[in-house]
Amino acid sequence: MRLRTWIVAVSVFLLPALSAAQSAVEAIDAHKHLGVASCSNSVCHGASQVFKDSHVMQNEFAIWQETDPHAKAYALLDKPASREIARKLGIGDATKAKVCLDCHTDNIAASQRGERFQVSDGVGCESCHGGAEQWLNAHADKKVAHADNLAKGMYPTSDPLRRAQLCLGCHMGTRDRMITHRIMGAGHPRLSFELDTFTWLGRPHYVIDEDWIARKGDWNGVRDWAVGQGVAADNLLDQLTDAKAGWQGIFPELVLFNCYACHKRMSDKSWGPRQGTGLGPGVVRLNDTNLSMYRHVLAAVDKGAAQQLLEQTRALHRATTESRDATIAAAKKLRSMLGESMPRVAAHQFDAASLNIILADIEADAQRGEFRDYDAAEQAAMAAQSVIVAFEASGAIDKTKGEALHGKLDAVYATLKSDTGWSMSSFQSAIKALRAAAP
């Protein structure tokens, strides 16, 4: 087993402990944040072009500032749409409201801000890499190992489990940073997240080369997708079982439920049964998209566990129609099952045979009507993309085959241009054509 796989497997094994001990938010905020300006010197990360003799690009600041949406996140709060959301919520100025600042900038406590720190920088370096107070100077020294920087508070973004926990804090919400249904009701855009896809959105400020691998271990996109699905599913259950964050009065926090279970036109007659829920029409159901995707992961790793996940997911859905106690008990049982399976997922070698199993399992679910909602189909499309890229990286397909598959993948995404005009049958046809063209 390679070192990177062992590290990921160990961190996944410790998933429940990590959730209970130090969250990603707490880890990021553990040390003083010195500000983006402390990283943007032209001989550090603020160069205008890539340094050829450096183990990092050194123009990371320019890439972030010019092309990364994170750099513009704070500025969005002063837009008319943001001001209207804040007005509806009754929280005052969006550029000063904690619930907005927590995700639209680096909202570290005032006592933890260095002299060059600026809230207006948006989601900057230390929002993801952790407070640089102890590692800023050390990480520039080539003689200092990456592990030493991590020990000084640098956040382990190369570890897919910890990266997923970090990203979910804002891209879906966690128990210590809840993004509630009230925020959505006030007009905030729907949230969606998939680790592998979102890691590569936009222009990356790093290159996975031999030097990167030597310092941080192998990179495997499908494994990142798989681990990310497991962490996202665990995060849902973590919130659902938290009496303070996951419940509002007698109801679970509604943001944990599927948007499209309720948000349909009254004239819509598209309801149909889903094997994955076992529920009838007119029932508000949990957003189980990550649980469904993780079942496709397990199809390639442990078929028995995949069946167990299906049964326990159905039991959770059933429990939500019974009582609060039944829901929490079912969620805890399912979360335990996830924790037991994830070390095997992290250690699994996703070869061409595994990729075929995953893609076939997704296509089979599509044909039986499991992706009845837009958000489920969206997750299936991102999963298919990770699989296709992995086929290419493994050498299982040549350039011509890869181009053909990407054409089929484009057709899948074309069915997802709008959630208002989305057609399940069109998606089924597109994903079937993609599967037929795969190796």
PLM regions: where:
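Bacterial N-terminal signal peptides
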Residues: 8-17
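Short N-terminal segments immediately surrounding and downstream of signal-peptide cleavage
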Residues: 22-42, 46
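Primarily the internal scaffold of c-type cytochrome electron-transfer domains
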Residues: 23-26, 48-87, 115-123, 131-381
